[in-house]
Each structure stands twice: as C-alpha cells, then as structure tokens.
Regions:
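Short acidic beta-strand-loop surface patches of small beta-rich interaction domains
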Residues: 1-3
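Loop/turn positions that initiate beta-strands
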Residues: 7-12
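Short, hydrophobic beta-strand segments
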Residues: 13-18, 58-69
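N-terminal catalytic cores of NTP/NDP-binding nucleotidyl/phosphoryl-transfer enzymes
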Residues: 14-43
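Divalent metal-coordination and catalytic microenvironments
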Residues: 32, 62, 140
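Secondary-structure transition/capping motifs at alpha-helix termini
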Residues: 40-46, 87-88
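Short, flexible active-site-proximal loops enriched in glycine and acidic residues
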Residues: 44-57, 72
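Non-catalytic interaction/regulatory segments
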Residues: 56, 65-147
Length: 147
C-alpha cells in the first residue's frame, strides 16, 4: 500500500487500474467515498444502512434503509459531495484493531450485519479504514486518498 514506508532495498511495482487488483482497489475506494457522501448528505440519523448489492457495467446497484428518501435530488447532492471529497484528496487511513474493538465499532455505527459476521471471525486483528470521521471495514486494499 502506498502509505507504507520502504524499510529495505526492494523493487516497487505499481498496479494500474487496468489490472484486476487495481480495479478492485479503485472500486472499493469509490464505494467508500459513495458511502461517506450518502451519510454526509442524508445525515447519519436518517440512514440506517446502505447495502451495495452488485455492479451493472460500471454502475453499482444499492439500497438504502432509513427515513431519507432516495430520489434524484439526493442523488444529485451525493454526486456533488463525492466530487468535493475527490477534489480534496483526503487521506484514506488504515488502522489495525482487535476484532472485539471492530465489533464494538460496528455496533456503535449500527452496522449490525457486520457486527454479527465478525463475532464468528477467528482472526484477532481487523483493518478498519477511515475517511475523516467515517469508518468502515473493507476486504482488500484501498487507494491512499480520495483523489
């Protein structure tokens, strides 16, 4: 990952978006930005959760539960917010926490499906990504920033 320092002599290679690993990293990062934008625009108190179901071409099909109404006005505001986040090139920070701490975080953020899933996780550490005050878990690498 690009935020890590090289500690010994080695060969560094870059993974472009045209390769599968690069595309997946880009997509995860874009989803993270989308989720943050939705919660920023609609308000955390108005969104219970967002579920990304699958992709259709270059688009994502998702559902949103809560009192916020998913309409064209909200979509337009989310798009503007995503562009603001991208333009600011905000670091996407990764931290390793205990699985128990991750479970507590998921509960605090009303991510009950992840909370339940992680109760069965055997690994003691989990990587949590944060974008300003927004946190989530993703399986795989992320871009170093929103730009």
């Amino acid at each position: 990952e690009l935020h890590q320092k090289v500690r010994q002599v080695c060969t560094v290679g870059f993974i472009p978006a045209k390769e599968s690993a690069g595309r997946k990293t880009y997509r995860r990062s874009a989803v993270f930005i989308l989720l943050k934008a939705i919660f920023d625009v609609a308000g955390k108190e108005n969104v219970d959760h967002v579920v990304i179901h699958y992709s259709i071409g270059n688009a994502l099909y998702f559902t949103m539960k809560g009192s916020a109404i998913l309409n064209q006005e909200l979509i337009d505001k989310v798009k503007v917010r995503m562009r603001e986040l991208v333009d600011r090139k905000i670091p996407i920070c990764k931290r390793s926490v205990s699985t128990d701490d991750a479970i507590s975080m998921f509960h605090r953020h009303h991510m009950y499906d992840k909370e339940k899933l992680f109760r069965y996780r055997r690994v003691s550490k989990v990587n949590i990504y944060s974008l300003e005050n927004f946190e989530d878990y993703f399986y795989g690498f992320m871009a170093p920033d929103t730009g």
